Amino acid sequence: MLILVSPAKTLDFEQPPLTQTHTRPDFLAYSQELIQVCQRLTPSDIATLMKVSDNIAGLNAARFGEWTPDYSIDNAKQAIFAFRGDVYTGFDADTLTPEQLERTQSQLRILSGLYGLLRPLDLILPYRLEMGTALANPKGKNLYDFWGNTLTEAVNNAVAAQGDDIIINLASNEYFKAIKRKQLAGQLITPVFKDFKNGQYKVISFFAKKARGMMARYIIDQQVSSIEELKAFDVAGYYYSEELSKPNEPTFLREAQ
């Protein structure tokens, strides 16, 4: 069972990681190509392209300028400990045991605009480059063009290494669009999380993101290996709804918080 998640805008490069163990991203040569494109952008270009404030644009212009492919644990941090958004709050990597971290390294993959596909212990530098960014590059008009079939092939290879064909998609639509769905060599399962609000169950972004992280952690903790076992997910008040689920979209509901 392979789990796909999105990265996060919020980063933490201050707190020491849980372990010194690390790996090197598989697609650093691709990342270098993108960085070379980004280094030609002015802070004003970045502000317009990424729709961010001047301060954030300036910060990222500096990050692009300082980027280096020479990674070590001294100047970089493992992705699973560096990302600090809602998904990662739900996953809570800082409480993983060594055995759980080993399973996470095997089963979890993080889609990334800059790095393509990351393993949890792959070292990264601080960056911001969302997959939906319309960054013109030598391969096309955006990052979907840039990554092409590369990430789909990488996911297929990672699935094959799991020994089964189940892919749990806990990534956002923006990031999963980088995967060619029809070329996936596996059974794609996309869980849906709905909370009760104003008289109906609906997807609420903040809660859904955190739930994706909690489900990823549940799969690791419980060593889930089948869709039936996944339906037992009951963290933070969520429960499986047979009525609202579709074959490849198991739906989990939660009452008002």
Swiss-Prot record:
Under InterPro entries, the record lists: YaaA (IPR005583)
Q: List the disulfide bonds.
A: none
Q: Name one GO cellular component term.
A: cytosol
One Pfam assignment: H2O2_YaaD
Superkingdom, natural source = Bacteria
Give GO terms for biological process: response to hydroperoxide
Q: State the PANTHER family in the record.
A: PEROXIDE STRESS RESISTANCE PROTEIN YAAA, PEROXIDE STRESS RESPONSE PROTEIN YAAA
What protein family does this chain belong to? Belongs to the UPF0246 family.
Q: What is this protein called?
A: UPF0246 protein Shewana3_3143
Q: Which organism is it from?
A: Shewanella sp. (strain ANA-3)
